[in-house]
């Protein structure tokens, strides 16, 4: 059991496994709901592009068979299965590391990574690729890449773990 007294001034006790399960589940469900809405309700897979805020936010359908920025795309079925297994193993490693930490921040950041990674794993299982659809362009600079809620969650989780004051003392 951990306490959040140093963060919120209250001595509420909680189990790290429950915190990770709740936050990861929230991210996972949010990711899957947004993908379902965009792919199936808005039919982005058929329309390919929808302008949300002109010159800033677009929904551009991209099926990412690889990893970040499409690396290893167009690989074999074995590579897809390998990526699924590696993602699950990394999630398990992060989970078992995080539950040993005495920091709500490290639990939060770890949960963001786990929830996002599992969202992308489900895409690989269901669709054979990750459904990316968010595209942000700014100031006249064209951005060819699309991403999703899971990617955002993973990004902030990794950045949070790297820059968390609690992680500086960790190996």
Label the model's feature ranges.
Residues 1-171:
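Alpha-helical transmembrane bundles and membrane-interface segments of multipass inner-membrane proteins
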């Amino acid at each position: 059991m951990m306490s959040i007294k140093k963060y919120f001034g209250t001595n509420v006790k909680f189990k790290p496994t429950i915190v990770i399960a709740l936050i990861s589940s929230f991210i996972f469900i949010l990711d899957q709901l947004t993908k379902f809405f965009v792919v199936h309700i808005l039919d982005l897979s058929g329309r390919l592009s929808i302008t949300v805020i002109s010159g800033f936010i677009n929904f551009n359908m991209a099926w990412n068979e690889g990893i970040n920025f499409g690396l290893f795309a167009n690989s074999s079925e074995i590579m897809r299965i390998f990526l699924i297994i590696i993602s699950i193993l990394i999630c398990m490693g992060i989970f078992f590391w995080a539950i040993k930490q005495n920091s709500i921040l490290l639990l939060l950041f770890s949960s963001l990574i786990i929830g996002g990674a599992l969202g992308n794993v489900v895409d690989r299982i269901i669709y054979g690729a990750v459904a990316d659809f968010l595209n942000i362009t700014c100031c006249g600079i064209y951005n060819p890449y699309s991403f999703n809620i899971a990617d955002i969650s993973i990004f902030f989780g990794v950045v949070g773990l790297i820059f968390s004051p609690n992680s500086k003392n960790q190996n």
